[in-house]
């Protein structure tokens, strides 16, 4: 094969450098590179000294077509052929011929042949070209960053979708772009979006947000675990009762030895783990979203994790959707801090979810719901249920009493009226079968009793003794009312006073009044634990050791009548 020596700069298009632009030095016309050479009749000629005018290109095309299809073998004369080197074959056999390219390993031999043909035929085109634009140029990024992201000069006029990403019209000029265009990742957000999302640092709690992301550890003593069946979203009072039941199952009675194990509770925004204190082995591992409830009852911490039961067969069972609650009971002086840390982890995880998904909190209802913004009140729940409001017609003999004993609903009640405290056995009220202890009497024969004193209500009942038919407007309520008191901290006062288990005074507008506590009621249970026969000091301890208190009360007069401490006066 014979190679033509490079002419001495004849008039025409400028020379084209075939040296790889990715090297440490880019050869120019004035400084030809000698890294690659071809042996020709005129002596060694570097590739940078070769000029690809029309005649040279035509002869190179003919030489390339005359070569065998397999360019992997060495050149017969022992010296490498420039085209052999240009096609990326070198002196070694390529393992993957499809991956070979022109210096930059971007194009194969077929691409080179097509490119040389295009280059040879380009001068014959009749379209006039600006001489200043005939010289090939390296790809340059656009000067206007807001303009078209595509490359400007040196870019192909061919549509972008008409060639593959692994080749280009001028692969020896295609280098790594000076400014690469990168699409923002999916998780990136604009400053406006980040500003609209809740900041992780704004979540209150005992731990720092960064600490919870990495994980914090609290020391505790593991008492034991038990299982309970529960619905998916029971009422808070039900949750507290379940926590109390789990504690009663696991915790040893007072005076007995309580077996316990030293553990570490690991809390993060992903998981809650129970680790052995000595070996740090994971004893229990729960994803954060499976934690259903955390109750701190004094120094006792109850951690409840949800697990779905097997698929139910009947439609009733599928609608009920029972879950298995794994209740872990711990003893720690930092039980309240542990419960707060888990709650803070939930808040931070939710804030991270909003930020990562670029969700505006105002559009997904991150504000507290109406039900959560109002404190729980047992009376209000019953009053809002229209099925509890009914009218009862009692048939009796003229001159016969109704056979009901009435008491006051208590100061602070949402509906101040008379309450049925007892029913005479065999009397007209009991015979009708529609009345029960705890029902609120709002009217009698159309006359309202709401807001009247107990004496006025009793007088209105006595006036209907002469009638044979009496209609009572009632609201069905259980004899025991549940009040829920929520405080930001245990140091905040409850807002009521207790004497011998009876609420004797109430702070107007306090947490107790908002939760449904009423003066004159006797406390029956505190957080699921009966206090009927409990000493006064112990009752005060139960009321002050937790931030959220669930109290079951009933009118003290009703309690005395039901326990036989007083004799009822039937009307």
UniProtKB/Swiss-Prot annotation:
- Modified positions (N-acetylmethionine) in chain numbering: 1
> What's an example GO BP annotation here?
regulation of gene expression
Region listing for Disordered, in residue ranges: 1-48, 67-195
Q: Which GO terms describe its cellular component?
A: perinuclear region of cytoplasm; synapse
- Where in the numbering of this chain does the PID domain appear? 214-378
Q: Write down the InterPro entries for this protein, in alphabetical order.
A: APP-Binding, PDZ, PDZ_sf, PH-like_dom_sf, PTB/PI_dom
Write out the biased-composition intervals (Low complexity): 98-115, 155-171
Q: Where is the PDZ domain?
A: 391-477, 482-556
Using the record's annotations, give every residue carrying the modification Phosphoserine.
168, 369
A Gene Ontology MF term for this entry?
enzyme inhibitor activity
Annotated tissue distribution: Ubiquitous.
Domain notes from UniProt? Composed of an N-terminal domain, a middle phosphotyrosine-binding domain (PID/PTB) that mediates binding with the cytoplasmic domain of the amyloid-beta precursor protein, and two C-terminal PDZ domains thought to attach proteins to the plasma membrane.
- Name of the protein in its database record: Amyloid-beta A4 precursor protein-binding family A member 3
């Amino acid at each position: 094969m014979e190679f033509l020596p490079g002419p001495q700069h004849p008039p025409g298009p400028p020379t084209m450098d075939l040296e790889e632009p990715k090297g440490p030095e880019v050869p120019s016309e004035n400084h030809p590179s000698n890294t690659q050479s071809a042996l020709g009749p005129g002596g060694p000629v570097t590739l940078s000294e070769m000029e690809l005018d029309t005649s040279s290109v035509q002869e190179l095309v003919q030489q390339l077509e005359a070569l065998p299809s397999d360019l992997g073998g060495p050149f017969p004369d022992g010296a490498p052929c420039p085209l052999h080197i240009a096609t990326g074959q070198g002196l070694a056999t390529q393992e993957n011929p499809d991956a070979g390219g022109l210096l930059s390993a971007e194009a194969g031999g077929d691409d080179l042949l097509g490119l040389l043909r295009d280059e040879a035929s380009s001068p014959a085109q009749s379209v006039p070209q600006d001489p200043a634009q005939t010289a090939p140029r390296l790809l340059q990024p656009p000067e206007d960053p807001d303009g078209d992201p595509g490359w400007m000069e040196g870019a192909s006029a061919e549509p972008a979708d008409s060639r593959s990403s692994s080749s280009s019209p001028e692969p020896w000029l295609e280098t790594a772009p000076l400014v690469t265009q990168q699409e923002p990742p999916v998780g990136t957000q604009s400053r406006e979006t980040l500003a609209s999302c809740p900041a992780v640092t704004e979540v209150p709690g005992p731990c720092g947000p960064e600490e919870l992301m990495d994980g914090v550890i609290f020391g505790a003593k593991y008492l034991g675990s038990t299982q309970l069946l529960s619905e998916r979203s029971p009422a808070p009072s039900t949750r507290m009762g379940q926590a109390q039941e789990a504690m009663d199952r696991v915790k040893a009675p007072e005076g007995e030895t309580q077996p316990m194990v030293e553990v570490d509770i690991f809390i993060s925004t992903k998981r809650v783990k129970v680790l052995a204190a000595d070996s740090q082995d994971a004893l229990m591992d729960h994803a954060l979203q499976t934690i259903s409830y955390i109750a701190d009852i004094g120094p006792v911490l109850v951690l409840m994790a949800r697990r779905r039961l097997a698929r139910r067969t009947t439609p009733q069972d599928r609608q009920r959707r029972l879950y298995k609650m794994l209740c872990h009971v711990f003893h720690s002086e930092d039980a309240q801090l542990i419960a707060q840390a888990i709650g803070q982890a939930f808040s931070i995880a939710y804030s991270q979810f909003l930020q990562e998904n670029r969700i505006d909190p105002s559009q997904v209802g991150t504000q507290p719901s109406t039900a959560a913004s109002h404190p729980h009140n047992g009376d209000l729940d019953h009053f809002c249920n229209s099925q509890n409001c009914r009218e009862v017609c009692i048939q009796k003999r003229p001159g016969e009493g109704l056979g009901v004993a009435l008491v006051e609903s208590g100061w602070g009640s949402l509906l101040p009226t008379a309450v049925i405290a007892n029913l005479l056995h065999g009397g007209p009220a009991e015979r009708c079968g529609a009345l029960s202890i705890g029902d609120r009497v709002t009217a009698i024969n159309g006359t309202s009793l709401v807001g009247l004193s107990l004496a006025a209500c009793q007088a209105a009942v006595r006036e209907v003794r002469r009638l044979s038919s009496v209609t009572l407007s009632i609201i069905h309520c259980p004899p025991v009312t549940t009040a829920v008191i929520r405080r930001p901290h245990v140091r905040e006062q409850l807002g009521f006073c207790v004497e011998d288990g009876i609420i004797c005074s109430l702070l107007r507008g306090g947490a107790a009044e908002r939760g449904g506590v009423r003066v004159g009621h006797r406390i029956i249970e505190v957080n699921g634990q009966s206090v009927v026969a409990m000493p006064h000091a112990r009752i005060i301890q139960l009321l002050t050791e937790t931030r959220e208190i669930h109290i079951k009360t009933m009118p003290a007069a009703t309690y005395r009548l039901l326990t036989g401490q007083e004799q009822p006066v039937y009307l």
